[in-house]
Amino acid sequence: MAKIPAPDENGKPSNGERNYAEHFLDPFLKALEQIDVRPRIIDNYESYESGKFAEKSRIACEKHNEIRDIIETISGRELAEDWFPFNPYGHDGSLDRVTVTGFEWPYVYWVQDGVEGKSDLNKAEGKLPWRIDWPAKWGWVGVTCEPFGKDHGAAGGSYATGKEISKLFGDNPPHPLVYEWISLKGQGAMLSLIHI
Protein backbone atom coordinates (compact mmCIF):
# COMPACT_ATOMS: atom_id res chain seq x y z
CA MET A 1 0.00 0.00 0.00
CA ALA A 2 2.94 2.34 0.66
CA LYS A 3 4.16 2.12 -2.93
CA ILE A 4 0.75 2.29 -4.62
CA PRO A 5 -0.21 5.84 -5.62
CA ALA A 6 -3.44 7.21 -4.16
CA PRO A 7 -6.34 7.36 -6.60
CA ASP A 8 -7.10 10.73 -8.19
CA GLU A 9 -10.62 12.22 -8.39
CA ASN A 10 -11.37 9.86 -11.33
CA GLY A 11 -10.18 6.76 -9.50
CA LYS A 12 -7.00 6.52 -11.60
CA PRO A 13 -3.48 6.36 -10.08
CA SER A 14 -2.38 9.86 -9.07
CA ASN A 15 1.03 11.48 -9.49
CA GLY A 16 2.30 9.68 -6.37
CA GLU A 17 2.42 12.59 -3.90
CA ARG A 18 0.35 10.46 -1.53
CA ASN A 19 0.13 6.71 -1.33
CA TYR A 20 -2.93 4.47 -1.22
CA ALA A 21 -2.65 3.88 2.54
CA GLU A 22 -2.42 7.60 3.38
CA HIS A 23 -5.37 8.36 1.09
CA PHE A 24 -7.70 6.07 3.03
CA LEU A 25 -6.18 6.62 6.48
CA ASP A 26 -6.50 10.43 6.44
CA PRO A 27 -10.34 10.59 6.52
CA PHE A 28 -10.38 8.04 9.34
CA LEU A 29 -7.90 10.08 11.39
CA LYS A 30 -9.90 13.27 10.75
CA ALA A 31 -13.05 11.53 12.01
CA LEU A 32 -11.23 10.41 15.16
CA GLU A 33 -9.98 13.95 15.70
CA GLN A 34 -13.59 15.19 15.72
CA ILE A 35 -14.29 12.99 18.75
CA ASP A 36 -10.98 13.96 20.38
CA VAL A 37 -9.25 10.62 19.80
CA ARG A 38 -5.58 11.00 18.92
CA PRO A 39 -4.04 7.57 18.29
CA ARG A 40 -0.34 6.86 17.95
CA ILE A 41 0.09 5.73 14.35
CA ILE A 42 2.72 3.11 13.58
CA ASP A 43 3.31 2.88 9.84
CA ASN A 44 4.15 -0.73 8.98
CA TYR A 45 6.13 0.10 5.84
CA GLU A 46 8.19 2.74 7.64
CA SER A 47 8.77 0.24 10.46
CA TYR A 48 10.24 -2.28 8.01
CA GLU A 49 12.21 0.50 6.29
CA SER A 50 13.78 1.67 9.57
CA GLY A 51 14.70 -1.87 10.66
CA LYS A 52 12.19 -2.27 13.49
CA PHE A 53 11.19 -5.69 12.11
CA ALA A 54 14.78 -6.82 11.39
CA GLU A 55 15.40 -8.78 14.60
CA LYS A 56 12.04 -10.58 14.51
CA SER A 57 12.57 -11.28 10.79
CA ARG A 58 15.98 -12.79 11.58
CA ILE A 59 14.49 -15.04 14.26
CA ALA A 60 11.65 -16.07 11.94
CA CYS A 61 14.09 -16.99 9.15
CA GLU A 62 16.40 -18.89 11.50
CA LYS A 63 13.48 -20.74 13.11
CA HIS A 64 11.41 -21.26 9.96
CA ASN A 65 10.87 -24.97 10.70
CA GLU A 66 9.53 -24.24 14.19
CA ILE A 67 7.21 -21.54 12.83
CA ARG A 68 5.99 -23.89 10.09
CA ASP A 69 5.27 -26.52 12.76
CA ILE A 70 3.38 -24.01 14.93
CA ILE A 71 1.18 -22.86 12.05
CA GLU A 72 0.50 -26.35 10.67
CA THR A 73 -0.13 -27.95 14.07
CA ILE A 74 -2.35 -25.22 15.51
CA SER A 75 -4.24 -24.16 12.37
CA GLY A 76 -4.54 -27.67 10.95
CA ARG A 77 -3.54 -26.50 7.47
CA GLU A 78 -0.55 -27.60 5.45
CA LEU A 79 1.79 -24.91 4.17
CA ALA A 80 3.27 -25.09 0.68
CA GLU A 81 6.57 -26.94 0.38
CA ASP A 82 8.37 -23.71 -0.61
CA TRP A 83 6.77 -21.65 2.18
CA PHE A 84 9.17 -19.35 4.05
CA PRO A 85 8.40 -16.93 6.92
CA PHE A 86 9.63 -13.89 5.01
CA ASN A 87 8.24 -12.66 1.68
CA PRO A 88 10.94 -10.80 -0.28
CA TYR A 89 10.08 -8.38 -3.07
CA GLY A 90 11.25 -9.71 -6.42
CA HIS A 91 13.06 -7.90 -9.24
CA ASP A 92 9.78 -6.33 -10.39
CA GLY A 93 8.89 -5.08 -6.89
CA SER A 94 6.11 -7.61 -6.32
CA LEU A 95 5.74 -10.65 -4.08
CA ASP A 96 4.29 -12.73 -6.92
CA ARG A 97 6.23 -15.73 -8.24
CA VAL A 98 9.10 -15.19 -5.76
CA THR A 99 10.67 -18.34 -4.31
CA VAL A 100 13.11 -18.14 -1.41
CA THR A 101 16.30 -20.09 -2.12
CA GLY A 102 18.30 -19.37 1.03
CA PHE A 103 18.98 -17.23 4.06
CA GLU A 104 22.19 -15.87 5.50
CA TRP A 105 21.85 -12.88 7.81
CA PRO A 106 20.95 -10.21 6.81
CA TYR A 107 19.88 -11.49 3.38
CA VAL A 108 17.07 -13.66 2.08
CA TYR A 109 18.03 -15.04 -1.34
CA TRP A 110 15.32 -15.57 -3.93
CA VAL A 111 14.50 -16.26 -7.55
CA GLN A 112 11.64 -14.75 -9.57
CA ASP A 113 11.03 -15.72 -13.19
CA GLY A 114 14.61 -16.97 -13.48
CA VAL A 115 16.09 -13.77 -12.04
CA GLU A 116 18.05 -14.24 -8.80
CA GLY A 117 18.30 -11.61 -6.10
CA LYS A 118 18.58 -10.92 -2.40
CA SER A 119 16.58 -8.86 0.08
CA ASP A 120 18.05 -7.17 3.15
CA LEU A 121 16.05 -7.80 6.33
CA ASN A 122 17.21 -4.42 7.68
CA LYS A 123 15.28 -2.60 4.95
CA ALA A 124 11.80 -2.67 3.48
CA GLU A 125 12.79 -5.23 0.82
CA GLY A 126 10.06 -7.67 1.82
CA LYS A 127 7.86 -8.46 4.77
CA LEU A 128 6.75 -11.15 7.15
CA PRO A 129 3.49 -12.96 6.28
CA TRP A 130 0.58 -11.56 8.30
CA ARG A 131 0.40 -14.43 10.82
CA ILE A 132 4.04 -13.72 11.70
CA ASP A 133 4.01 -9.93 11.27
CA TRP A 134 1.24 -9.60 13.90
CA PRO A 135 3.12 -11.29 16.79
CA ALA A 136 6.41 -9.69 15.69
CA LYS A 137 4.77 -6.30 16.12
CA TRP A 138 3.41 -7.19 19.56
CA GLY A 139 6.96 -7.56 20.82
CA TRP A 140 8.69 -4.42 19.57
CA VAL A 141 5.63 -2.17 19.98
CA GLY A 142 5.02 -3.47 23.50
CA VAL A 143 1.41 -4.57 23.04
CA THR A 144 -0.06 -5.92 26.30
CA CYS A 145 -3.73 -6.26 25.29
CA GLU A 146 -4.92 -7.11 21.76
CA PRO A 147 -8.59 -6.78 20.76
CA PHE A 148 -9.73 -8.83 17.75
CA GLY A 149 -12.82 -10.41 16.21
CA LYS A 150 -13.92 -13.84 17.38
CA ASP A 151 -12.76 -15.46 14.12
CA HIS A 152 -9.13 -14.62 15.00
CA GLY A 153 -9.72 -16.05 18.48
CA ALA A 154 -11.24 -19.34 17.29
CA ALA A 155 -9.37 -22.60 17.83
CA GLY A 156 -6.59 -22.71 15.25
CA GLY A 157 -7.03 -19.02 14.52
CA SER A 158 -4.42 -16.34 14.07
CA TYR A 159 -4.23 -15.43 17.77
CA ALA A 160 -3.52 -19.06 18.73
CA THR A 161 -0.63 -19.27 16.25
CA GLY A 162 0.49 -15.73 17.05
CA LYS A 163 0.67 -16.47 20.76
CA GLU A 164 3.11 -19.35 20.18
CA ILE A 165 5.14 -17.42 17.61
CA SER A 166 5.38 -14.52 20.08
CA LYS A 167 6.89 -16.89 22.65
CA LEU A 168 9.33 -18.17 20.00
CA PHE A 169 10.40 -14.53 19.53
CA GLY A 170 11.08 -14.35 23.28
CA ASP A 171 8.10 -12.11 24.02
CA ASN A 172 5.04 -12.37 26.23
CA PRO A 173 1.92 -12.49 24.04
CA PRO A 174 -0.68 -9.82 24.80
CA HIS A 175 -3.85 -10.56 26.72
CA PRO A 176 -6.63 -11.33 24.20
CA LEU A 177 -9.80 -9.26 24.12
CA VAL A 178 -12.15 -11.13 21.79
CA TYR A 179 -15.21 -9.27 20.51
CA GLU A 180 -18.32 -10.24 18.59
CA TRP A 181 -18.80 -9.32 14.96
CA ILE A 182 -20.54 -6.06 14.18
CA SER A 183 -23.70 -6.39 12.10
CA LEU A 184 -25.04 -3.65 9.86
CA LYS A 185 -28.73 -3.67 9.08
CA GLY A 186 -29.30 -5.31 5.72
CA GLN A 187 -25.63 -6.25 5.29
CA GLY A 188 -25.06 -8.94 7.90
CA ALA A 189 -21.93 -9.47 9.94
CA MET A 190 -18.77 -7.53 9.15
CA LEU A 191 -16.09 -10.23 9.23
CA SER A 192 -12.35 -9.87 9.53
CA LEU A 193 -12.01 -13.23 7.75
CA ILE A 194 -10.92 -11.58 4.50
CA HIS A 195 -7.80 -10.30 6.29
CA ILE A 196 -6.49 -13.75 7.38
Predicted regions and their residues:
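N-terminal Rossmann-like or analogous alpha/beta NTP/dinucleotide-binding catalytic cores
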Residues: M1-R68, G162, F169
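Intervening/peripheral non-core polypeptide segments
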Residues: M1, I194-I196
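Alpha-helical recognition segments enriched in aromatics with Gly/Pro capping
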Residues: K63-D69, T73-I194
